[in-house]
Regions:
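Short helix/turn-capping signatures at newly exposed starts of structured segments
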Residues: 1-155
Length: 155
């Protein structure tokens, strides 16, 4: 199970310099690491995002297990920002945790779990609409059900 604790994912801490990581972590196919580009010496670059490259059905966030049986409640409590992808998967952005979840509801999988550094917060936090607003708009506009064909008779 993936573990997110403060600003780390499975013990990989944001803000660490590239030189602090060994080749095992840098080349691990389960994680994608992104370093800043503001340093001339590449080994001085700091980690700004880390994401899981594997699909999972649950993860731990500061000791709380999040899975598909409690995801809806978690979303209602946290009211994240939301975006819908072309494939009808959902991106949830949690500014409070510097966390992005890419969710596939058809297969009940978290396709990507990403944490980001404070230095790039504005790249993530200004996108999408609030989860609560998105839910209200779904109730007002029932034609958002993309799985169903709805016929509206001409009057």
């Amino acid at each position: 199970m993936l573990k997110i604790l403060n600003n780390s994912l499975d013990g990989i801490v944001l803000g660490q310099q590239k030189a602090d990581f060994d080749d095992v972590i840098l080349n691990n196919p389960n994680y994608s690491l992104e370093f800043d580009r503001k340093h001339k010496i590449q080994s001085d670059s700091e980690l700004i995002t880390v994401s899981s490259s594997r699909n999972c059905d649950e993860f731990s966030l500061n000791g709380k297990v999040i899975n598909f049986s409690n995801l809806e409640k978690f979303l209602e409590e946290e009211d994240p920002l939301i975006e819908v992808s072309d494939e009808e998967n959902y991106f949830y952005i949690f500014p409070k945790y510097n966390l992005v979840l890419y969710v596939n509801y058809k297969d009940n999988l978290f396709l990507q779990i990403l944490i980001y550094d404070e230095s790039i917060r504005d790249l993530y936090d200004n996108k999408g609409k609030k989860y609560s607003d998105f839910q209200k708009s779904k109730l007002r506009n029932p034609t958002l059900n993309h799985d169903k064909l709805i016929f509206i008779p001409y009057k």
